[in-house]
């Protein structure tokens, strides 16, 4: 609920390409006020030092601190459904640190009981189409095809109003190999011959699982920012990266929160 309220009364342009998310007006002055009001609520448990009116840059960053074992995957799945219901956001990329977590996330999203819960118990009239990006085995000579999961994600249409498209990717695939950076595939997607460019064109929302493994100076995070240029990054985790602020004697190390909306202590 808190994440959805960040976008309250912010201008959202729905007149976009059928394969793209609506365009959020990231210059809106409403973001700062909305975020600060959410942080002030007692139930959000956000410490005073983390309540601040930070400006929004080219990407809106939102942080949710949840201890391990408190239902993080469930919460961000709920967030996906709610953002789709309220604002028509239907393209989400979930970045995870490992192949094991990637498999676990995919299993959760595809579970029959999970689908039934969100549809029958919570009343969301939408279905998540789950794609999992896998490493491609070295191809022999012949035609080079776009990664199947990327194609399905990008080509997913907003005209299917009850469909949400999710692509799960582990961090190594964002930085190693040429699968997402090469531009010599034989077939293009929506006019794009490079997978990263095709993904960027969807104006995705990115969910980062376990943000301490995606620090700002790490290659995978840099790839998310520079190659995907998401409209919004939402980080869910028990531990967040550290960052150094100040100079000289005032230099100190603090948690690298950006717009912390919730702090759930176990």
Model regions and ranges:
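Inter-Walker segment of RecA-like/P-loop motor cores
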Residues: 116-186
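Surface-exposed intrinsically disordered loops and tails
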Residues: 21-54, 134-152, 183-195, 216, ...
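Conserved Walker A/P-loop ATP-binding site and its immediately adjacent core
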Residues: 75, 88-134, 171-173
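ATP-dependent helicase/translocase motor core
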Residues: 1-70, 74-88, 107-111, 115-116
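Extracellular/periplasmic catalytic domains that process cell-envelope and extracellular macromolecules
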Residues: 57, 159-163, 227
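Signature of the SF2 helicase/ATPase Hel1-core->accessory helical subdomain module
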Residues: 78-85, 99, 103-107, 168-266
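Short, high-confidence coil segments that cap the C-terminus of an alpha-helix
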Residues: 89, 162-164, 230
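Extended hydrophobic secondary-structure segments that form protein cores and membrane-embedded regions
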Residues: 61-69, 76, 92-97, 127-135, ...
């Amino acid at each position: 609920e808190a994440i959805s309220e960040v976008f309250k009364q912010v201008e959202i342009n729905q007149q976009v390409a059928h394969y793209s998310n609506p365009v959020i007006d990231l210059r809106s002055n409403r973001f700062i006020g909305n975020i600060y009001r959410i942080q002030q609520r007692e139930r959000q448990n956000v410490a005073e030092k983390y309540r601040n009116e930070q400006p929004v840059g080219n990407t809106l960053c939102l942080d949710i601190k949840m201890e391990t074992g408190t239902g993080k995957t469930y919460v961000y799945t709920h967030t996906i459904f709610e953002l789709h219901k309220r604002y028509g956001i239907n393209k989400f990329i979930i970045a995870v640190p490992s192949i094991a977590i990637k498999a676990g996330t995919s299993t959760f999203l595809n579970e029959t009981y999970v689908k039934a819960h969100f549809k029958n118990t919570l009343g969301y009239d939408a279905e998540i189409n789950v794609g999992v990006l896998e490493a491609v085995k070295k191809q022999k000579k012949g035609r080079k095809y776009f990664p199947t999961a990327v194609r399905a994600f990008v080509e997913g249409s907003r005209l299917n109003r009850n469909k949400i498209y999710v692509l799960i990717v582990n961090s190594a695939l964002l930085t190693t190999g040429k699968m997402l950076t090469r531009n010599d595939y034989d077939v293009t997607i929506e006019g794009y011959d490079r997978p990263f460019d095709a993904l960027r064109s969807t104006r995705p929302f990115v969910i980062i699982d376990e943000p301490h493994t995606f620090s700002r100076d790490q290659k995978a995070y840099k790839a998310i920012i520079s190659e995907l240029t998401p409209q919004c990054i939402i980080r869910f985790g028990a531990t967040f990266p550290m960052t150094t602020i100040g100079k000289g004697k005032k230099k100190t190390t603090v948690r690298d929160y950006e717009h912390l909306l919730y702090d759930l202590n176990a």
